[in-house]
């Protein structure tokens, strides 16, 4: 999915407003995903998945860091996320549908924390961005 100049601007502006909360929002999105889509828990059998667990917070920070890197490389998502794509495809073997579920959970999290900034245009741009990230992360499954 190709991001327009307006999409890129919206994504950068929205992610900029996330600021120092990125790791917290990442953890919250994971918690939402685990609650809304319980089958996603199967990839984390060794995690304490309770609210506020250190393991969920730690993985939320990893998710947030990867997205921050992606936002910084909107013109080269495949290059920026190549190692992460390899990890998820070859080592972790995460079912690609889970990226869509996490993307949805992240959009809900961002909308709940940034209600005044989460306009329809920003929503659409973030959705396209997360779909692009998901596409890159699943590209090495083939």
Curated annotation (Swiss-Prot):
InterPro entries, alphabetized: Globin, Globin-like_sf, Globin/Proto, Hemoglobin_a-typ, Hemoglobin_oxygen_transport, Hemoglobin_pi
Binding site for heme b: 88
SUPFAM superfamilies tied to this protein: Globin-like (SSF46458)
The keyword Metal-binding is assigned to this record: yes
Keyword field contains Iron: yes
Keywords per UniProt: Heme, Iron, Metal-binding, Oxygen transport, Transport
Source organism superkingdom: Eukaryota
One cellular component term from this protein's GO annotations in UniProt: hemoglobin complex
Free-text tissue specificity from the UniProt record: Red blood cells.
PROSITE patterns noted in UniProt: GLOBIN (PS01033)
Domain Globin: 2-142
GO biological process: hydrogen peroxide catabolic process
Binding site for O2: 59
MF (Gene Ontology): haptoglobin binding; heme binding; iron ion binding; organic acid binding; oxygen binding; oxygen carrier activity; peroxidase activity
Function according to Swiss-Prot or TrEMBL: Involved in oxygen transport from the lung to the various peripheral tissues.
Quaternary structure and interacting proteins, as annotated: Heterotetramer of two alpha chains and two beta chains.
Similarity remark: Belongs to the globin family.
Designated name of the protein: Hemoglobin subunit alpha-4
């Amino acid at each position: 999915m190709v991001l327009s100049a307006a999409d890129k601007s919206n994504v950068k502006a929205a992610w900029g407003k996330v600021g120092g909360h990125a790791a917290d929002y990442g953890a919250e999105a994971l918690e939402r995903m685990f609650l809304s889509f319980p089958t996603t828990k199967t990839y984390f059998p060794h995690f304490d998945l309770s609210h506020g667990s250190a393991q969920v917070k730690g993985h939320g920070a990893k998710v947030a860091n990867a997205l921050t890197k992606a936002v910084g490389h909107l013109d080269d998502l495949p290059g920026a996320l190549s190692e992460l794509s390899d990890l998820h495809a070859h080592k972790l073997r995460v079912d690609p549908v889970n990226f869509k579920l996490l993307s949805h959970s992240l959009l809900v999290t961002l909308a709940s924390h940034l209600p005044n900034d989460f306009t329809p245009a920003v929503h659409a741009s973030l959705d396209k961005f997360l779909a692009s990230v998901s596409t890159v992360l699943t590209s090495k499954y083939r």
